[in-house]
């Protein structure tokens, strides 16, 4: 309802961005985040995009690219942020930093405020329907544990096993009609049909709907079922990453006869740190002191490196396969 006289209102283009904005991401442009969150919006809105790719993500090279390219806005994959945090990376001339792919915890957000002098915005989406949920610090401070609210133009819900919206844990779904939603899986009509239930695109991600946003629990395959608990790995990973000895980590469920699964952590330590049983116990206790008791990793293995995608995400599927293989070897 509009009431009264509607005057002519002159608006600045600054509403769409700042004149000095300049975009960059270390992510490959073949990834939906690099393509639809950086390259295409930059081209559409006339914002410069820096093309600079590293063979291996390094903090010093990141700082050089930002400086030489006069970058003001960066989209970082979560693993890139973890590497920067582990190196005590610091830069204060960025206007915005965004991240998508995995949830960020309270410690990472606090680090962003200290070392980047800003609040990191979280995005959520997938190739089939990109950036449907987001935090925006220009509107409100993010709430730890929530990945944000539906972006205008998208209707997002959480469905139970019967395809009915629920406030309990369920599958995150997006209603048809979103501009960023796929048309189809190319020449795969059956796979396309299975991606939808009625009018909803099913993401395959588990979540919970709250009044102030949506909680991401994990990929359906990533959720660990242990002694009746359903456990998302991200919270445990984020906790372990706050320990000064941990460089990166992947958490999965390992098959177990009595508990169905146990929480298993695969950890890469920082240079100079000793990977032994004592360190494993220290890290277990570290999690016990900070999270609910059922969340601590009952087993920890140390690796030289973790399997990663080209976009910097830990490939938990390969870690689960490794855990299954360990079980088979233990039975022999």
Describe the residue ranges of each PLM region:
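Conserved AMP-binding/adenylation subdomain of ANL enzymes
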Residues: 3-73
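Gly/Ser/Thr-rich phosphate-binding loop
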Residues: 44, 71-76, 84-142, 155, ...
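AMP-binding/adenylate-forming catalytic core of the ANL superfamily
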Residues: 74, 178, 183-184, 191, ...
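Glycine-centered tight turns that cap/initiate beta-strands
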Residues: 93, 117, 153, 245-248, ...
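Active-site glycine-centered loops adjacent to acidic/histidine catalytic or metal-binding residues
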Residues: 101, 125, 148, 205, ...
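Conserved ATP/PPi-binding loop(s) of AMP-dependent carboxylate-activating enzymes
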Residues: 149-153, 164-194, 231
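Acidic/polar alpha-helix N-cap and adjacent early helical turns
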Residues: 321-332
């Amino acid at each position: 309802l509009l009431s009264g006289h509607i005057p002519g209102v002159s608006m600045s283009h600054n509403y769409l961005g700042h004149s000095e904005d300049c975009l960059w991401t270390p992510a490959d442009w073949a990834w939906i985040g690099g393509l639809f969150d950086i390259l295409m919006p930059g081209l559409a809105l006339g914002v410069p995009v820096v093309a600079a790719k590293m063979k291996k993500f390094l903090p010093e090279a990141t700082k050089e690219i930002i400086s030489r390219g006069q970058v003001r806005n960066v989209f970082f994959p979560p693993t890139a942020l973890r590497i920067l945090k582990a190196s005590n990376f610091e830069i204060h001339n960025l206007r915005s930093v965004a991240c998508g792919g995995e949830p960020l915890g309270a410690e990472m957000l606090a680090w962003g405020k200290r070392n980047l002098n800003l609040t990191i915005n979280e995005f959520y989406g997938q190739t089939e329907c990109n950036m449907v949920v987001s935090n925006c610090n220009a509107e409100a401070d993010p709430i730890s544990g929530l990945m944000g609210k539906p972006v205008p133009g998208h209707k997002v819900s959480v469905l139970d096993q019967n395809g009915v919206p629920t406030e309990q844990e369920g599958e995150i779904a997006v209603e048809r009609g979103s501009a960023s939603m796929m048309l189809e899986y190319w020449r795969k009509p059956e796979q396309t049909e299975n991606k939808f239930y009625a009018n909803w695109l099913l993401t395959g991600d588990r979540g919970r709907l709250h009044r102030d946003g949506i909680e991401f629990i994990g990929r359906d395959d990533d959720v660990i079922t242990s002694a009746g608990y359903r456990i998302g790995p991200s919270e445990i990973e984020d906790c372990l990453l706050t320990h000064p000895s941990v460089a990166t980590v992947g958490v999965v469920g390992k098959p177990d006869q009595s508990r169905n699964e146990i929480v298993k952590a695969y950890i890469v330590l920082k240079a100079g740190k000793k990977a032994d049983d004592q360190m494993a116990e220290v890290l277990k206790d570290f999690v016990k002191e900070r999270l609910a008791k059922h969340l601590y990793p009952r087993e920890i293995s140390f690796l030289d490196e973790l399997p990663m995608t080209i976009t910097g995400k830990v490939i938990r599927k390969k870690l689960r396969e490794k855990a299954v293989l360990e079980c088979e070897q233990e039975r022999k």
